Swiss-Prot record:
Statement: the UniProt record of this protein carries the keyword Ribosomal protein: yes
Gene Ontology MF terms in the entry: small ribosomal subunit rRNA binding; structural constituent of ribosome
SUPFAM superfamilies in the record: Ribosomal protein S20 (SSF46992)
Keywords associated with the record: Ribonucleoprotein, Ribosomal protein, RNA-binding, rRNA-binding
Residue span of region Disordered: 1-20
PANTHER family: 30S RIBOSOMAL PROTEIN S20, SMALL RIBOSOMAL SUBUNIT PROTEIN BS20C
GO cellular component, one term: cytosol
Chain's gene name: rpsT
Species this protein is from: Phytoplasma australiense
Name assigned to this protein: Small ribosomal subunit protein bS20
Protein's job: Binds directly to 16S ribosomal RNA.
Any one GO biological process: translation
Gene3D superfamilies: Ribosomal protein S20 (1.20.58.110)
Source superkingdom: Bacteria
Protein family (similarity comment): Belongs to the bacterial ribosomal protein bS20 family.
């Protein structure tokens, strides 16, 4: 347990940030899963719409340092490859 006053404050803010990040990651995973489901069902319109949302969420996560930039780029590339299978 922290004895220093500032560290106690930091622990509070770190916990708030951790909970916010968990929520954000969960929402991102849900959208990515929706893209994969749309591809399995060969629903082009739904896949493209969800792909756009997934890109937005991943980019936002990278800018807020929730995700590493390489992780985001890799996921975006893999999702695009997946969607391209039903587009062609």
């Amino acid at each position: 347990m922290a004895n220093i006053k500032q560290q106690k404050k930091r622990n509070k803010t770190n916990e708030k940030r951790r909970l916010r990040n968990i929520s954000f990651k969960s929402a991102t995973k849900t959208i990515v899963k929706q893209v994969k489901i749309a591809v399995e069902q060969a629903d082009k319109a739904k896949a493209l719409a969800n792909l756009s949302l997934a890109y937005q969420k991943l980019d936002k996560g990278a800018s807020k340092k929730i995700y590493h930039a390489n992780f985001v780029n890799r996921n975006k590339a893999n999702l695009q490859k997946l969607v391209n299978t039903i587009l062609s």
